[in-house]
């Protein structure tokens, strides 16, 4: 099924039908436009973009102009908007609230005269009607909100009404009184006896974001856009709800004045309204310009600034500035001849989803993307739109073949807003036929792939996270530049001189496929890379102009790469870019497990047994080292890099690798720490790894705990993994020295704080020495601090230590402590 009119050949063309077909088409268009107008103006729940409504309206308008006999009194072309809501008191407008005729510019055309042809025609009509060589126009943004009329008697607000159908609207006085931007009493000593002001109620972008955040927090439905939020808020029967919605208002015209002089120009009206206390849009957005060229310049300037404005607009408005000229031009049936709304390229449009694919970002985030039938929206042709994440795709139920509403605002990445379900491709339900009533969607619901589309690594989505990620951090082509940039960082491998530009070009030109390739780079590779990069960017260095080749930077970079071949194990682990593994966690792994070989073999439960490593971090570590592509990349890296400080596992592991501790970290349902201790007292890990379900029934534990344990063990691979964990644990414990042999470190259990500048040690060097001696470095002084090491220009931390009576050391005192003195 398609929307009638889809495929229409152009914005002004009239399709040639036999007369009966023209009558049918006109009736069809009237029915569609009445329905869409009701959804937009009355229900505040539009189902099609504004651009689609405008296109159908203009088709009907062109059809009626070509065939006047088709025009009827209730045609949407003779109306302004929707009917008033029944729940509000109806108000007849003393001066009808007419809408404006629309002009459009085809921003795909390069010739300004062609692009703004409708604008030029408007200016020509105005000049001809006034018999004037040039006309001044007042300009202003076309707000995307809800038009209202405000009536003041003797300076006091007595009535507020919506536009409704232009002749009659709804009285919303109590709600409008809650809008702080609207004056309840006019400024000035002598207000007019009667004043009717018209303007727009709207919601600022920031207030819209706050409102939707509040809606989400309460579990309520969010609003699609600021216009819907403003309209829905103003039409609340309970004005207390309106008061909570942070509505704004801008005045843009005067409808009637009594007992005061009416300014002679529109610009004068705006200046007068400002003195009376009305908010009007900033001066820079409402200049007075001359002729079609001035109008076109204003249009393009505001179009460029649109995304940065604090409110939504969908075009601009031009009005003949002088009131006497407005009166001379008069009105047509539905709009003034002296004003026109110039619509921006639609920010929303209908198109079809041809495919759904996945993009992998530099950090491994996997984003579903809709491949679209090309559509012009927001000033550009859009062929792709983000679907954000799997949850969003399912919430909107976007499928291949769907007709969707696509939105592009400013420089924002195009997104799929919603699906037009009435146009979803359907097929007979399974087991049915073409004549049966049952139908089902032709295309299935979207499912995120389990393997990365770039490298084939496993896709991991952590509990509570909306984003799924590729686990092949070291090997994934999409993540290559980011992975290398992190790897080379100062606190990681500290490869000085290897910046983002060089990394991107090394990857782009194929010199580096992974981190291991850095160590195979030759001087000529770097020089050739830079020559190509400069050429691509149109840069000619001074040395090249002089016929020379600057190579010192490349020699220094090769030296820096070579200097990183024997890093501390903790730095190497941090450099791998494992998700959730920061500097502190990397140090814990290095201190407790000692070697990369052992770390690579550990399952999640063993990682979780280490201090300060929780389940999420443990799972991330295990997933990283279990991924085949990462394993290959790590093998290649370790052929070039050898950690300088590998050592035997920490003797303290003996206290953490007992059966009860490991069982408690396996996340077995119902197996609490207490139950883990009870189970470990009866059976070993090795026994559980080989046990049959019936053997578990003999355990002295509650039946629900035993059943949960049995179900967990029955999952494929669980018993083998448990047996492997037990075997690795036993191997580690067997390698540990006897308890008596384990020498205590000089700063074991001590917390130190560094402040000021030390004579010979940098902050990082001092921290490394303290941690190697078993101590912990904290960033703040407290009663639990054992020592503060103070250098020159020590600040508030020194004063805090003196206040708390904490021992204070200089660098010599620290060295003495490290030596065990």
From Swiss-Prot:
Region forming the signal peptide: none
Recorded GO MF terms: DNA ligase (NAD+) activity; metal ion binding
Catalyses which reaction(s): NAD(+) + (deoxyribonucleotide)n-3'-hydroxyl + 5'-phospho-(deoxyribonucleotide)m = (deoxyribonucleotide)n+m + AMP + beta-nicotinamide D-nucleotide
Binding site for NAD(+): 50-54, 99-100, 140, 163, 200, 319, 343
Keyword annotations of the record: DNA damage, DNA repair, DNA replication, Ligase, Magnesium, Manganese, Metal-binding, NAD, Zinc
Residue positions of the active site: 142
The protein's name: DNA ligase
Organism: Chromobacterium violaceum (strain ATCC 12472 / DSM 30191 / JCM 1249 / CCUG 213 / NBRC 12614 / NCIMB 9131 / NCTC 9757 / MK)
Gene (UniProt): ligA
